Amino acid sequence: MKRALRALLSIGLLMSCQVHARELRVCADPNNLPYSDEAGEGFENRIVELIARDLGAHVDYTWWAQRRGAIRNTLNAGACDVIPGMASSSGMSGTTDPYYRSTYVFVSRADHGLQSLASLDDPRLRTLRIGVQLVGDDGANPPPAMSLARRGIVDNVRGYTVYGDYADKAPQAPVIDAVARGDIDVAVVWGPTAGYFASRAGVPMVLAPVTPWLDGPQSPMVFDISMGVRRNDRALRRELDRALLRERPAIERILDAYHVPRVPMMAVAPVPSP
């Protein structure tokens, strides 16, 4: 009888701990590989889970397509506390210390002899068939599209929407698939997208960081990536900063597994005690 009572008490305590376990409330896109998806197969999913374990928490996702207005309607509306994969320079929320820095890259087939293509000023870009990712027609397109347009490189450029076909499992893959098929000669794509899909293209591909890294004040080619938090949530930001620092080697292994190209980050100072 006593053993049965002890067992019941143990079960009750376990259930109580589970009910009161800490939640890390995260907003993420349910169909945006290689970053995140509802099956948890993206590298941001894996990094979020890693950080949650470090904090003794479990992840509670709110799924929301990464479109304009997403931060306003999720993080800033209180639907979640964290959004992974935000540019550190974003002015739409607070951000943690960066956990990686990536770059736009030129992507070409290894058998097309374009390994030396690395600069937006390379004269070959005036005749090559180029693929770029586009957001819309309101001037808010990614930096490579704007940089090419400023150079008058327009007629030989083909656009692929950065959102892709949301009915597909990999909406951002088409621009890399087009390079692999030979429909275009080179694509200029954000590094994590390029690295992931190029590694799965079925033909050897070459990636080269785009230079210059800063092509005018409105066209940086390199971005630090952080987790987004509300500006006034300083305590959570400090916690995340410490966890990101502790887990940096594991984060690097995750990024390697997803073929994310990186450029060196400046050293991050230790997070002061609250």
Feature map (PLM): residue ranges:
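N-terminal signal peptide c-region/cleavage motif recognized by signal peptidases
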Residues: S16-Q18
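Periplasmic-binding protein-like
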Residues: D29-N32, R101-Y104, G113, G159, ...
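Extended ligand-binding regions for polar small-molecule ligands
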Residues: G42-L55, A110-L114, A118-G139, D215-P261
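Extracytoplasmic small-molecule ligand-binding "clamshell" domains
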Residues: A21-M92, V132, D165-A170, I176-D177, ...
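Hydrophobic residues within well-ordered alpha-helices
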Residues: I51, T74-N76, P123, A178-A180, ...
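Ligand-binding clefts/hinges and TM-proximal coupling segments of bilobed small-molecule sensing domains
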Residues: H58, W64, V132, G136-Y163, ...
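A ligand-binding cleft/hinge motif common to bilobed small-molecule-binding domains
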Residues: G69-A70, N76, P84-G94, A180-S219
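Bilobed "Venus flytrap"/periplasmic-binding protein-like clamshell domains
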Residues: P30-R53, F106-A170, P192-T193
